[in-house]
Amino acid sequence: MAVEKDQQKDAEAEGLSAATLLPKLIPSGAGREWLERRRATIRSWGSFVDQRRFSRPRNLGELCQRLVRNVEYYQSNYVFVFLGLILYCVATSPMLLVALAVFFGACYILYLRTLQSKFVLFGREVSPAHQYALAGGVSFPFFWLAGAGSAVFWVLGATLVVIGSHAAFHQIEAVDGEELQMEPV
């Protein structure tokens, strides 16, 4: 009995941390592994937003160098900035929330229906891929009315501006051995 309670507490503690950092809605597989790797390689948010480390680049060469190095160094942070902008866009657009609810509701209904029996339409069995395509087709008018196309381009534009600005103006750390070395001619 005591062992079961300890295991349950461990599972709850483990589930709590996983629930706060990684949604359980993401199925195990390639997507979850990718997100776990991103979360594991995330850099310190303190150094990411440290205002003392922002300055104007001296020339175009330094700007390009900063862009490349910062995108490489803060890649995981930038992924989470992108995901945050997506969540912001969805949360501030009620019609987009309705369209997403219709789409995911249709997918869930199809999922439950396939657990009970195979889906037959006009005497033919419909594959799961075609069923989800049908759910997307049914949801398409809702996405169109919600302005999902403009939301996608808003997210892409905002991401490019935020990440591009950060990468361009955030000073890169000097790493030993990567200094510019002059060779005699």
From Swiss-Prot:
| Cell compartment(s), UniProt | Cell membrane; Cytoplasm; Golgi apparatus; Cytoplasmic vesicle, Secretory vesicle, Synaptic vesicle
Identify the stretch(es) annotated as Required for interaction with GDI1.
Answer: 165-185
Entry superkingdom: Eukaryota
InterPro entries, A to Z: Prenylated_rab_accept_PRA1
Cellular component (GO) terms are:
Golgi apparatus; plasma membrane; synaptic vesicle
Membrane topology of the entry: Multi-pass membrane protein
- Stretches in topological domain Cytoplasmic: 1-78, 113-131, 166-185
Residue ranges of the region described as Required for interaction with prenylated RAB3A and VAMP2: 30-54, 175-185
Where do the segments described as Homodimerization lie?
Answer: 175-185
The record lists the membrane-crossing segments as 79-94, 95-112, 132-148, 149-165
Q: Which UniProt keywords apply?
A: Cell membrane, Cytoplasm, Cytoplasmic vesicle, Golgi apparatus, Membrane, Synapse, Transmembrane, Transmembrane helix
Q: How does it assemble?
A: Homodimer. Interacts with VAMP2 (synaptobrevin-2), prenylated Rab proteins, GDI1, NDRG1 and PCLO.
Family statement: Belongs to the PRA1 family.
Job description of the protein: General Rab protein regulator required for vesicle formation from the Golgi complex. May control vesicle docking and fusion by mediating the action of Rab GTPases to the SNARE complexes. In addition it inhibits the removal of Rab GTPases from the membrane by GDI1.
- The name this protein carries in UniProt is Prenylated Rab acceptor protein 1
The upper taxonomy is: Eukaryota, Metazoa, Chordata, Craniata, Vertebrata
Q: Which gene is the coding source of this polypeptide chain?
A: RABAC1
